[in-house]
């Protein structure tokens, strides 16, 4: 069993390694396009959404700053991956966006690649283990989000006091 300090190191190094690998995989998937890795999740989200989404919704779903999403959405529209949803008159955070045919084609490639990656890396893990893993991962993510937002002073104080 890992000691507390070893768990911290293992967690940080593993998450960092996973993040780097995911970024390399995203770049590989879109290497024949003019897209950036940050675009992949937005195109995927628009593909799976039954309705058009706003830049604000894409920012919330991807936990990325709205101003970055807004700038990149302009690129995606200008490059022909996205268009304003029917009836939209101007661009803004609340303007609904939809995939163009070009955007749908690459979003489908992203979705197929994501599924292939999941099957490849999860092939040796049982369905029950995956359920537990994702449940624990989501709880850790939520807890870290609260700590990063609210600060760790209270937690650090309790740990130092031996609570």
Where are these regions (language model features)?
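Alpha-helical linker/hinge and terminal dimerization helices associated
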Residues: 15-18, 22-25, 29, 62, ...
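N-terminal positioning helix adjacent to the helix-turn-helix/winged-helix DNA-binding module
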Residues: 7, 18, 38-41, 95, ...
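N-terminal leader segment of winged-helix/HTH proteins
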Residues: 1-33, 79-81
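Charged, amphipathic alpha-helical coiled-coil/dimerization segments
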Residues: 74-135
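C-terminal regulatory/oligomerization modules of transcriptional regulators
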Residues: 1-4, 128-163
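N-terminal helix-turn-helix DNA-binding core of bacterial DNA-binding proteins
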Residues: 24-68
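Short, hydrophobic-biased segments on the C-terminal half of alpha helices
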Residues: 55, 73-74
């Amino acid at each position: 069993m890992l000691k507390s300090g070893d768990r911290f190191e293992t967690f940080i190094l593993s998450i960092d390694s996973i993040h780097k690998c995911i970024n390399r995989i995203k770049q590989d998937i879109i290497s024949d396009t003019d897209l950036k890795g940050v675009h992949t999740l937005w195109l995927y989200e628009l593909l799976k959404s039954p309705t058009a989404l706003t830049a604000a919704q894409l920012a919330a779903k991807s936990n990325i700053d709205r101003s970055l999403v807004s700038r990149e959405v302009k690129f995606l529209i200008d490059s022909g991956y996205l268009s304003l949803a029917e009836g939209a008159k101007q661009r803004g955070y609340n303007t609904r966006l939809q995939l163009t045919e070009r955007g749908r084609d690459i979003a489908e490639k992203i979705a197929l690649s994501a599924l292939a990656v999941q099957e490849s890396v999860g092939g040796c893990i049982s369905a029950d283990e995956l359920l537990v893993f994702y449940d624990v991962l989501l709880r850790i993510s939520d807890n870290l989000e609260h700590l990063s937002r609210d600060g760790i002073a209270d937690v650090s104080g309790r740990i130092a006091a031996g609570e």
